[in-house]
């Protein structure tokens, strides 16, 4: 696979990792889950990202997961592998390993967390990863989890690297607009914030790397279709109903809410690995009512209780 596989991909699902009660990966659930995603307009899948609980997955588990998903997907949609850590050497070695493994359109590498690197440190980190293998790299800029934020200027420097093909941007819409205006033509820009997908697509973003597409992919697809058809009134009407669902899906540390909904829908994706824990039962019930049923009272509680989702 290559960057060309991602050219017209607008909805990429950052897929959860299903676990058994003993904490091991539940590979038996994967076929049903993946077919559900593909039948509801997922056009690409990110594995071993934040939503997959990658901090608590070993590289060996990730590679086993990659192989299992590749067999199920069988080339129907492009795959992206989470490969980044806050250790440049480890990120380089895993990027090489994933490149040798094959079958991925790109690797997603997060801005280094905890270390708090400078802009030059971020630049050198990603340049080193991109120089080290032929796996195309997408930068993951999410200061809410990382603490530091890559500036648009640093991003545009890295966008000139031939092996850095895009960004999953979770900063401001102002930053996204600036990047879209000034980026190289082939540089892909995805929002990583479901609630901002409407605005990002209207600004000219390439798509979304989504959690909500696990449960509300049809709505997202309909909204994007309306935007493409320049029917902003319809797209905005969908967005108004979509926002409370996104808020609900991020009203407790992710991916606990989306796992609660998927378990309710019968997918048996199981628990989370510590230090993450499931939503409290009453919260889970409210989240399910909002996301699945669009329940008015539960939606009102979500809107008044969450000013902005915590991605």
From Swiss-Prot:
Cellular component, GO, one term: cytosol
Residues the UniProt record annotates as site (Part of a proton relay during catalysis): 50, 114
Disulfide linkage: none
One Gene Ontology term from the biological process aspect of the record: diaminopimelate biosynthetic process
Gene3D superfamilies attached to this UniProt entry: Aldolase class I (3.20.20.70)
Reactions that this protein is recorded to catalyse: L-aspartate 4-semialdehyde + pyruvate = (2S,4S)-4-hydroxy-2,3,4,5-tetrahydrodipicolinate + H2O + H(+)
Pathway: Amino-acid biosynthesis; L-lysine biosynthesis via DAP pathway; (S)-tetrahydrodipicolinate from L-aspartate: step 3/4
Molecular function per GO: 4-hydroxy-tetrahydrodipicolinate synthase activity
The enzyme's E.C. designation: 4.3.3.7
InterPro entries in the record: Aldolase_TIM (IPR013785), DapA (IPR005263), DapA-like (IPR002220), Schiff_base-form_aldolases_AS (IPR020625)
Residue positions binding pyruvate: 51, 209
Keyword flag Magnesium: no
Assigned protein family: Belongs to the DapA family.
Assembly, per entry: Homotetramer; dimer of dimers.
Name assigned to this protein: 4-hydroxy-tetrahydrodipicolinate synthase
Lineage, top ranks: Bacteria, Bacillati, Bacillota, Bacilli, Lactobacillales
């Amino acid at each position: 696979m290559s960057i060309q596989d991602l050219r017209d991909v607008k909805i990429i699902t950052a897929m959860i990792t299903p676990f058994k009660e003993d904490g091991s990966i539940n590979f038996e659930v994967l076929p049903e889950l993946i077919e559900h995603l593909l039948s509801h307009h997922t056009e690409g899948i990110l594995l071993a990202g934040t939503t997959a609980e990658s901090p608590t997955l070993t590289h060996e588990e990730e590679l086993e997961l990659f192989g299992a998903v590749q067999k199920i997907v069988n080339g129907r949609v492009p795959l992206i592998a989470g490969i980044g850590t806050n250790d440049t050497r480890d990120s380089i070695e895993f990027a090489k390993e994933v490149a040798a493994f094959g079958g991925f359109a790109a690797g997603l590498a997060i801005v280094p967390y905890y270390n708090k690197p400078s802009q030059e440190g971020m630049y050198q980190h990603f340049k080193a990863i991109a120089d080290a293998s032929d796996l195309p790299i997408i930068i993951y800029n999410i200061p809410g989890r990382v603490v530091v934020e890559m500036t648009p200027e640093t991003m545009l420097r890295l966008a000139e690297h031939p092996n850095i093909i895009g960004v999953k941007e979770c900063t401001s819409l102002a930053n996204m607009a600036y990047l879209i205006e000034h980026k190289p033509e082939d540089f892909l820009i995805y929002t990583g914030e479901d609630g901002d997908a409407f605005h990002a697509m209207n600004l000219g973003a390439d798509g979304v790397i989504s959690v909500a597409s696990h449960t509300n992919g049809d709505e997202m697809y309909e909204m994007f279709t309306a935007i493409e058809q320049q029917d902003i009134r319809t797209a905005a009407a969908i967005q108004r109903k979509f926002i409370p669902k996104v808020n609900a899906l991020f009203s407790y540390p992710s991916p606990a809410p989306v796992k609660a909904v998927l378990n309710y829908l019968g997918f048996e994706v199981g628990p989370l690995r510590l230090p993450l824990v499931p939503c409290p039962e009453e919260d889970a019930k409210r989240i399910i009512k909002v996301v699945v049923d669009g329940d008015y009272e539960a939606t009102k509680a979500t809107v008044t209780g969450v000013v902005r989702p915590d991605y």
